[in-house]
């Protein structure tokens, strides 16, 4: 049986991951990944929203045709995928908790008059982002990875904590992206 593998940008933009493919820059890792896909029996997919995001982060112009010939750019069929109501309930509850935590962080920083404003804003942004986004689905691109994996009964290859956490909730198989080369060679 051939695996359908769904990838996201993290395997090309997270230095800890892309350096397991190529020790150079993200574009070099993408080129090496393309080479791996040609030797693999697996079908590699990337949701269109993720592809658009990747193109904003990495200049793919020099390898765009090879990329699009090697990786299937496909949006999930959002109209025909059914999501378990409990998952939606859990997501809303998780977001409520995160928003409340974010408000507490903002209040804490608003009360702290001892730091300079630039330093305070920088620390606030970091803590707020961690509270609201880390470990959850925080973008439409993340949701598309999950939906496409559900649609294709696929395996997710991602370094995104939120994607991997929600993949686990949906019973979607994930592979540690640090093992990309080994995974694609089987």
Curated annotation (Swiss-Prot):
Top EC class, one word: hydrolase
Alphabetized GO MF terms: ribonuclease P activity
Could you confirm whether the keyword Hydrolase appears in this record?
Answer: yes
Please give the SUPFAM superfamilies that the UniProt record associates with this protein.
PIN domain-like
Pfam families recorded: PIN_5
Query: Keywords assigned by UniProt?
Result: Endonuclease, Hydrolase, Nuclease, tRNA processing
Which superkingdom is the protein from?
Answer: Bacteria
Q: Name one GO biological process term.
A: tRNA 5'-leader removal
Which EC number applies? Answer: 3.1.26.5
The record lists the catalysed reaction(s) as: Endonucleolytic cleavage of RNA, removing 5'-extranucleotides from tRNA precursor
The Swiss-Prot or TrEMBL record describes its family as follows: Belongs to the HARP family.
User: What role does this protein play?
Assistant: RNA-free RNase P that catalyzes the removal of the 5'-leader sequence from pre-tRNA to produce the mature 5'-terminus.
What name has this protein been given in UniProt?
RNA-free ribonuclease P
From which organism does this entry originate?
Hydrogenobaculum sp. (strain Y04AAS1)
